[in-house]
Amino acid sequence: LSLPQPDPGVLRKAQRGDERAFSIIVRAYQVPVFNYVLRLVGERSLAEDLTQEVFLRVYQGLPRFSLRSKFTTWLFQVTKNRVLDELRAVERRPRAVVDLDDVPALEVLDAPFERLEAIDAVWRAVEALNVDLKSALLLRDVVGLSYTEIADALEITLATVKWRIYKAREDVQLALAREGITFYAASEPDAVVTPAV
């Protein structure tokens, strides 16, 4: 599940301004960056804009990037910093009222209602986490970075990463338990996430 590093030759070409090489990098990492940003900000159009801005910053900073560092770690440092800037700016802006009729419904076909309900509850619980816990959890469980890569990307200690992920998972499980949703061990036959009856 770990995110692979880009080809060093492609990375060097991109550092020298080769747009084709940079587009290869963007294509390789655009989806994981977007998914991470979307889960942090919760709004698709904002996540799309922020993802574009992240890659603009990466393009601008690439000539100064040290090839001795892991690219994915640096990429998610840039991403984290841009998202935190946006979240701080949002806190200072007045909030608009959202009409629930304007929110599109989630449509997933061929999935049992209970499973969709459980998945939705998981994402609600993740969204309720504070940004520090949410960032660490998403980088691990959605993006697939190692604990060490997360520590580097978030510029925190390895012990702090482990605690944040542990605490985030614990908080999500408690939130789900409050909604009556239980998890069965993956080793059990036909293990699924279901609402408790």
Please place each PLM-identified region on the residue numbering:
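C-terminal edge and immediately downstream basic/flexible tail or linker adjoining helix-turn-helix-like DNA-binding
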Residues: 1-3, 13, 95, 124, ...
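Internal acidic/polar
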Residues: 1-8, 85, 93-119, 146, ...
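Short, charged helix-capping/linker segments at alpha-helix termini
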Residues: 3, 13-24, 34-53, 158
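Amphipathic alpha-helical segment used for protein-protein interaction
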Residues: 5, 12, 16-19, 91, ...
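Sigma70-family region 2
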Residues: 15-16, 39-44, 53-70, 89-91
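Structural recognition of an alpha-helix C-terminal capping motif at a helix-to-coil junction
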Residues: 35, 49-56, 69-81
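Arg/Lys-rich amphipathic alpha helix in sigma70-family domain 2
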Residues: 60-67, 77-97, 115, 167, ...
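DNA-recognition helix of helix-turn-helix
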Residues: 80, 84, 88, 133, ...
